[in-house]
Amino acid sequence: MSIGLSIVSCKKDSFLSEHWNHPLSTQRNPEVQLTQIESNLDPKQCANCHENQFKAWQSSFHAKSIGNGILWQKEILSFEEWNRCLHCHSPLPETKAEISETFQTHEILDSKRKHFPSGISNPSIQCASCHIRNQIWYGPPSRNLTANQLTTLQANLPHNGFKVQEEFESSAFCQSCHESPESGQKLNGKHLMEVYQEWENTSFAKKGIQCQNCHMPNRDHTWKGIHDPDFVRAGLQPSWSLTRTANGEIQIDAKLKSIGIGHKFPTYLIPKVYLRFFGKNQFGNRKLIEESILGRLVNTNLTEEYYDTRITPGNSHNVSFRFTLDEKAIKTLDWEIEVDPDEHYIRSFEESLREKGNLLSAETKKQLQLSLSEKKDSRYVLFTLSLPVPVSLPK
């Protein structure tokens, strides 16, 4: 299947600087005339015309950006820290007003009543978070109409049509929330989030392959990533071999290659990937022989980096070791690759529960416990490769 590539400037331009100028303004715009239905910004309202996008969004992490994992932290963060989190987790001032007293001003509450007349049941990232500013709709170029055709039709389209912005098909559009600011904290010379920078220096960027080409194929609004096994599998290639050494030991050479990922794998400091090698007996019992970890490990206070073993695009993580094989006990060799998408959160949340659990309110503690359980459940086995023993090994 071919993908359409967008050759656009990846530097922040004036549109993006204004579009993501936090905190965002309310949707007040007296110059725009809309009906009550048109001015209703509830995602369910958008679904009347954009059903596929709505259904995809419902299952996405964008639709879950305000959940137990962030809500419990409100009790331990300062107002300033909490509101800063909301810039990306709940960009609209109207949705922020649901979870932050700072945004419960007369102007914002008026705007919320007008544009969300049925209330806001989910104050996460919504359609309007990306597509609407001051009651003007923005989006990528139409795939079916020319610019002239679109201009002719605008007056007859709902909500006065939309303003075409090519930036919607640019990686730079995603940068403000998926890349630490230049002034942000660094560990070992690297920001906590550098996915845009990681991509910018790759062949993917040089070929014009944007974030959207992989994470929004055919403009799909599920934004699949590290939590989706099939999506991750498509970007990696595991291979391994066994040889017998002169003294009878078994030499294992394994390689996990990044073949379709436009940034480091895994990006960010949150996920970890475990490459484990087992010997398995005739009863199916396994014994761990070797383990190698992919990821960027930092402490929970975000003050020290212990290691960074992530794979850069097009490169591989190699594991080579020898061991003495008990051929009577071990019948199979397994190479298992497990992904823990939320490893850092799990470690951090467990520490918070242990050290602060008794200081938290009952509701907040429950949110923390629920989030911790959810994140532990996100682990999955990405690949399992097996070779029988005895095997035909080169001498």
Locate each region found by the language model:
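Outer-membrane beta-barrel translocator/pore domains, especially the C-terminal barrels
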Residues: 167-170, 223-225
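Bacterial N-terminal signal peptides
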Residues: 1-6
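Short Cys/His-centered divalent metal-binding micro-motifs
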Residues: 131, 178, 215, 219
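Sequence context of c-type cytochrome heme-c attachment sites
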Residues: 10-168, 176, 182-204
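Short, conserved sequence motifs used for protein processing/export or organelle targeting and
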Residues: 200-207, 212-213, 217-395
